[in-house]
Amino acid sequence: MLMASDMNRAVSFYRHVFGFEELMVSDYWSELKHGDAIIALHGGYGGGRNPIPLTLEFDDVLAAAERVVAAGGKIIDAPRQREGEPILLGVFRDPEGNEIFITQYIGH
């Protein structure tokens, strides 16, 4: 679950940046779907860091990072490979302040 102080802004961000579809939207609770994944947005909060970050995987994490910035998100740690890990990993904050990991599997 992600927190949102502005539900319309939060729903728009995840729809336009990542292609999530709306299952339901209200001021205080919204559900979005992408493939088999569903995320919930809880409204009425000031946003902020979620204790367990959501991780989204992409075929092109660098393009995803560009979409994040274009839509008002902030890159905290640009996508890069960490030593010994088979992924590119980046961290950003959405416009509501939630911390999200973005990854791309690159093999061994």
Predicted regions and their residues:
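Residue-level recognition of alpha-helix initiation/capping sites
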Residues: 5-6, 23, 59, 83
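Short glycine/proline-centered loop/turn elements that form peptide/ligand docking sites
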Residues: 9-10, 27-30, 85, 108
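Conserved active-site tyrosine of GNAT-family acetyltransferases
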Residues: 10-15, 68, 97
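Conserved short beta-strand elements that form part of the metal-binding/catalytic scaffold
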Residues: 21-52, 99-105
